[in-house]
Amino acid sequence: MKVIMTTKVDKASMNIMNKLIENFGFKETEYVFDGNPVYKRGDVLILTTNDEMIYYDYLDREIENQLGFKPEIIAFASRHSSKQKLPALTTHVTGNWGKAMYGGKDESFAVAIPSAMKLSLLKMSELNDLGWTVCYEATHHGPTELEVPSFFIEIGSSEEEWINDRAGEIIAETIIYVLDNYEKGRSKFKVALGIGGGHYAPKQTKRALEGDLAFGHILPKYAQPVSRDVMIKALNRFGEKVEAIYVDWKGSRGETRQLAKSLAQELGLEFIKD
């Protein structure tokens, strides 16, 4: 079973959930999760919790405890907040390059699913009639302690956008498309660790939208430098085979560029300098 995770404390999450139920034929089941109704459509369930999802480490275990199955993949339907209040549709995997400021553990990473995130970008971009930004975000926040692949898909960046009906529809349709197609998409994409650039990963986003690269974890410039151990830890937390390390050269620190280059060589991965 595939899981779409939502929370009552997030207006964007509730917006997306309502659109999923209205537009895609999800039906309420007799099951509950964290005291909330579970909705089902084919092999996809919508689960709802009562607190911020970024703190929900071991969610996969909790699903198994409460519902008796281990999910194949978890899509977190969420809001994105930023001071700039940039209207945006974003996707990313969770993890902490350093200290855990917002959920998860220090220097720990969730399992990335690059094909699902790439398909999310492509579908959001195709459906985006709002004129908003569509982009990756760098790896950040929790949860990190999950043993099944997961990704966040978000409406940003202020309440005005979180409750926007069309944004809710776009994300709902994107999630359904991605969960139906990510396994088929795998063979067409080149999976990469992304390094460099700002939080919204402009170069990685462009490469994913225009070419065959599919990014998992993304290390932005503001989180650099990291140790060799941390970079290897991130590389080991991909649910799909990593084929390349991509570096936004100008958007990276010198020591991080060199570390990426030497690791690519050592691990037999393609090194892509942009």
Swiss-Prot record:
It catalyses: a D-aminoacyl-tRNA + H2O = a tRNA + a D-alpha-amino acid + H(+); glycyl-tRNA(Ala) + H2O = tRNA(Ala) + glycine + H(+). This is D-aminoacyl-tRNA deacylase. InterPro entries: Deacylase_DtdA_archaea, DtdA. It comes from Pyrococcus horikoshii (strain ATCC 700860 / DSM 12428 / JCM 9974 / NBRC 100139 / OT-3). GO terms for biological process: D-amino acid catabolic process. Belongs to the DtdA deacylase family. It comes from the Archaea. Its cofactor is Zn(2+). GO terms for molecular function: D-aminoacyl-tRNA deacylase activity; zinc ion binding.
